[in-house]
UniProtKB/Swiss-Prot annotation:
Family: Belongs to the universal ribosomal protein uL1 family.
GO molecular function: rRNA binding; structural constituent of ribosome; tRNA binding
GO biological process: regulation of translation; translation
Organism: Mycoplasmoides gallisepticum (strain R(low / passage 15 / clone 2)) (Mycoplasma gallisepticum)
Gene responsible for this protein: rplA
Full protein name: Large ribosomal subunit protein uL1
GO CC annotation, single: large ribosomal subunit
Presence of keyword 4Fe-4S: no
Length: 226
């Protein structure tokens, strides 16, 4: 049985034309106005790509430092032999094999792991623990690096990871309901430009199929693709 729409959702859907494609700034304004949550909504972007994600070279993954930080504070675990540098850069937890053993024992009170390449052999053994939660460090996201301090600083300033899902979609929060619309536009364009630059050479035809923005639990608003 189809779920009945709430009055708020019906009102939100009735306030704009869901079939129309809007300029990015207008779409963001609509997304803000159609938010239906009692708490402050985030503004999210969804980019649908023409990718065959069964092929490794068409699985996009990486990280981006948006022009305007909209990330919640995160807990950073640094597994490194550069412990003084990691602490100075702002890591919440620092260690080596001791921290890996804590993870094996069930400790998961962190949001990102940044590590040196030398520790990836041991961390790789935790694939069944870290993989499903998206916590396995990866060179593509800058979380496997020799420059621990720089990586920690970037993530502390709001660096965000992105990756395609099974259907070739990329989702990211690019602002909050209270964020200035121009700042959200700049964040969204930064992500769109990066995704355009990452187009796999094997992709034929239209690469970006559609873009939409929405508030938390709000309706999607279609965006013009430039």
């Amino acid at each position: 049985m189809a779920k009945k729409l709430t009055k708020k959702t019906k009102a939100a859907l009735g306030s704009f034309d869901p079939k129309q494609i809007y300029d990015l700034d207008k779409a963001i304004e609509i997304a803000k106005k159609t938010a239906t949550t009692k708490f402050e909504s985030s503004i999210d972007i969804a980019i649908k790509l023409n990718l065959d994600t069964t092929k490794a070279d068409q699985q996009l993954r990486g990280a981006i430092s948006l022009p305007h930080n909209v990330s919640k504070p995160i807990r950073i675990l640094a597994i490194t032999d550069q412990q003084a540098e990691a602490k100075q850069a702002g890591a919440d937890f620092v260690g080596e094999i001791d921290k890996i053993n804590e993870i094996k024992a069930g400790w998961m009170d962190f949001d990102v792991i940044i590590t040196n390449p030398k520790f990836m052999i041991e961390l790789g053994k935790l694939g069944k623990i870290l993989g499903p939660k998206g916590l396995m460090p990866n060179p593509k996201t800058g979380t496997v690096t020799q420059d621990i301090a720089t990586a920690i600083t970037e993530y502390r300033k709001g660096k965000k990871e992105y990756r395609t899902d099974t259907f070739g979609n990329i989702h990211m929060t690019v602002g909050k309901q209270s964020t200035d619309t121009n700042k959200i536009v700049e964040n969204a364009n930064a992500l769109i430009d990066l995704i355009k630059s990452r187009r796999p050479s094997a992709v034929k035809g239209v690469y970006i199929q559609n873009i939409s923005v929405s508030s938390t639990m709000g309706p999607g608003v279609k965006v013009k693709i430039n």
